[in-house]
């Protein structure tokens, strides 16, 4: 079966969504055609993150007709994990906010290692062989030890899981994904 893509259509939808987001928060890093990170550090003390997230969702749905999911967390890696749960688990109504250490710890304990951004099948197998099975397990390992035995990318991931923002993109608190199926 062969499907045709309409890149101009996707780009138009993406541009409209990114414009809405940039109106809500000028610090935006467009990661891909369907993902963006917003830097909410300047707003963190001034806004309610729950209201902000639902306002983003509502505006994008009302103005553009596209459903989105939002993950808010101290680092990009944590935000992507939060976003994945927001998208996949209907109990969260498309929004997951990881703002307290206790909540983050609980969240990481329930997250299988293969769900982490950048960890594929081969790396999952290697980590499971040394008894690292969850995001929490990985977050408890010394990041330098991981860097010495694996690579700098995984070392950064460990630091991000610990709440230390170190991905080369600007520090962000919100991760948004547009479900591809909603474009069709």
Residue ranges with predicted function:
Residues 40-43, 178, 184:
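Hydrophobic pocket-lining residues within nucleotide cofactor-binding pockets
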Residues 67, 110, 178-179:
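Proline-centered helix-kink/hinge sites
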Residues 93-110:
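A short, charged helix-loop
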